[in-house]
Amino acid sequence: MQEERARPPNIAAYDRSMEYRSLGRSGLRVSTVGLGCNNFGRTNTLTESQQGTDAVIGAAIDAGITLFDTADIYGAERGLSETRMGNALGRRRDDIVLATKFGMDMGGVNGVDWDARGSRRYIRIAVEASLRRLQTDWIDLYQLHRPDPLTPIEETISALDDLITEGKVRYIGHSNLAGWQIADAEYVAALGSHPKFISAQNEYSLLEREAEKEVLPAVNAYGLGFLPFFPLYNGLFTGKFSRTGGPEDSRIMSLRPHLAADAPWDTMDAYADFCAARDITMLEATFAWLLAQPGLTSVIAGATRPEQVMQNAVAPSGWSPTAAEIAEISALFTP
């Protein structure tokens, strides 16, 4: 497969082309292209600096992207992504839907947690720390980053309910829950008359479709919005990679070269031919396939340069596939 020729982004298509969807059964509307902020403050990227982060965030807002997804653990140092975002947003805070997460090991940055990071005690510590770093009074979407086996989900949901009542959090979501855990959380929230989770984040892409077995059926059964992470498989579906490798400064080549080396290149070549026959980029086809999946609300894609943000923002408007074409792509990558 030959590397795709870079297509200049259609800047004129910006705001007018962006689609917005309701996140689950809520009144929260988000852009179908989200910005993953895990690279903010990460070494060896342009967004390692505050200036680079400012440029990417500014480009995203100008492009009509409203969903910004981070976590307290993101960045070269724990909390650094949130700090960079807080410094960058300023008066543009009201222009975005700010999503962050809690529940990972912060190495003591948030104080002692005794591994119970879904507990009422820890959630209170974590949210106050995130609010300080983000320089904001509220978080639009506060997400449990992973299940806490030490804390009953009843306690976690009750603690999050308190934050909503106080106005520090508007909506709640979760990440990395299994299908049965999604069902359990739904039942517990209803039983206690607590606010329900409105979103689920799990890994999902053409090359990682495990979520189709239990997670997506649960998401759709309970009306949650689905926010896939690694939707472009760490950048493999940007069209910049081939059997021989890709950009040396890319996330894959610098951190996870095995993903490119172990990719099913016969299938990737067939996918490239599918795209070439329709005069579309692999990025456009991949965004279209993702956004055609039931329940999928927004494709959260990372970026370290403004031009990457621009390319992601206009990708969904580049191609309107038929149901048969979506099925053909699915069949190419059948697990």
List the predicted regions and their residue ranges.
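N-terminal binding-site loop/beta-alpha segment at the start of enzyme catalytic domains
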Residues: 2-96
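Beta/alpha (TIM)-barrel catalytic core signal, keyed to glycine-rich beta->alpha loops juxtaposed to Asp/Glu
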Residues: 9-13, 153-334
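Active-site beta-loop-alpha junctions enriched in small/polar residues
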Residues: 38-40, 71-73, 101-105, 144-147, ...
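Active-site mouth loops of central-metabolism enzymes
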Residues: 38-51, 109-124, 145-151
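Short, acidic/polar
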Residues: 47-60, 118-135, 182-187
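Structural motif
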Residues: 59, 63, 133-134, 167, ...
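Active-site groove signature of glycoside hydrolases
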Residues: 131-151
